[in-house]
Regions:
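Short, Lys/Arg-enriched N-terminal segments with co-localized hydrophobic residues
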Residues: 4-20
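Bacterial N-terminal signal peptides that target proteins for export
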Residues: 19-28
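Acidic, serine/threonine-rich low-complexity disordered tracts
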Residues: 42-98, 130-217
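Predominantly extracellular/secreted and cell-surface proteins with exposed
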Residues: 96-139
Length: 217
C-alpha cells in the first residue's frame, strides 16, 4: 500500500466519523508507512555493486572509491579541515600515487604487485619501491612488508564485512621503521576499512570508517 492510498482511506474515514477517530488512524498510518520506509533503505554494498564505486565516511572525512583499469582504485578524499587528496591504490590497499595541495608523490614498486593477490592468511611479502616527487630527489628506496595475520569482521553501520588483518610496516633504506599499522582490508570491496595502531599495547587504537553507501546515491 503506497502513501497516496493510505491518505485517501484516512480522509474518507475522518470525513464520515469525525475527529474522534483521527488519533487512532494516525497511529495505524504510521504502522503501515514505517515498514515501507524501511523497505526502501538501500542494500549494503557487496563485491558486485562495489565495481560501480562507493563512498566510505566518518566524521571529518569522506572517501569516494572508484575501481579503474590495471587493478587500481581511484580514491578521492574530502576533508573538513584540509584540502582534498587524490590517491591511486593497487587492489585498494597499496598506495602508488598521491596528489594534494601539499604535493605530489608516486611510489614505484620494483616487483609485480599482481603476484601478491589474492591475499591469503599467513602470507608474507616485502615490496621495495622508490618514492618520486617533483620537488624532492630520492636518496634511498623504501620497503613495505605485508603480513596477513588472519580473518575478522568489521561493521559499517548495519553492513558487516569479512576483512583480513594485514600488518603493514614501512622502513627506509637504513632499516628504520617509518610507519606501522594493521589494515582491516575487505577483499570484496577492495578497500581498507580501518587501521589499527599500536596493536597489542595499552595504546592500541582503531581509526576506521563508519558508514558506506553506493557512489550513485
Amino acid at each position: 500500500m503506497n502513501v497516496c492510498h493510505v491518505y485517501l482511506r484516512l480522509h474518507l474515514i475522518w470525513k464520515k466519523r469525525g475527529s474522534v477517530m483521527k488519533s487512532a488512524f494516525i497511529g495505524m498510518a504510521l504502522a503501515v508507512l514505517l515498514p515501507a520506509s524501511v523497505a526502501f533503505a538501500g542494500p549494503c554494498v557487496d563485491a558486485k555493486s562495489a565495481k560501480n564505486g562507493f563512498i566510505l565516511a566518518r566524521p571529518g572525512i569522506k572517501s569516494e572509491f572508484r575501481p579503474v583499469a590495471g587493478e587500481m582504485t581511484s580514491v578521492t578524499n574530502t576533508y573538513e579541515s584540509q584540502s582534498p587528496q587524490k590517491q591511486f591504490l593497487f587492489a585498494g590497499l597499496i598506495e602508488v600515487f598521491r596528489d594534494s595541495d601539499t604535493g605530489r608523490l608516486a611510489m614505484i614498486p620494483f616487483s609485480d604487485l599482481r603476484k601478491l593477490f589474492p591475499l591469503k592468511t599467513g602470507a608474507r611479502s616485502t615490496i621495495e619501491f622508490v618514492e618520486l616527487s617533483p620537488d624532492k630527489q630520492p636518496k634511498a628506496t623504501t620497503t613495505l612488508t605485508l603480513v596477513v595475520k588472519g580473518k575478522e569482521t568489521f561493521s559499517l553501520g548495519d553492513c558487516k564485512y569479512n576483512v583480513l588483518a594485514v600488518n603493514e610496516t614501512f622502513k627506509n633504506g637504513a632499516g628504520e621503521t617509518l610507519d606501522a599499522f594493521t589494515a582491516l582490508y575487505s577483499p570484496d570491496l577492495q578497500a581498507a576499512l580501518a587501521r589499527r595502531y599500536d596493536e597489542g599495547t595499552s595504546a592500541q587504537s582503531v581509526n576506521g570508517y563508519e558508514t558506506i553507501k553506493p557512489l550513485s546515491e
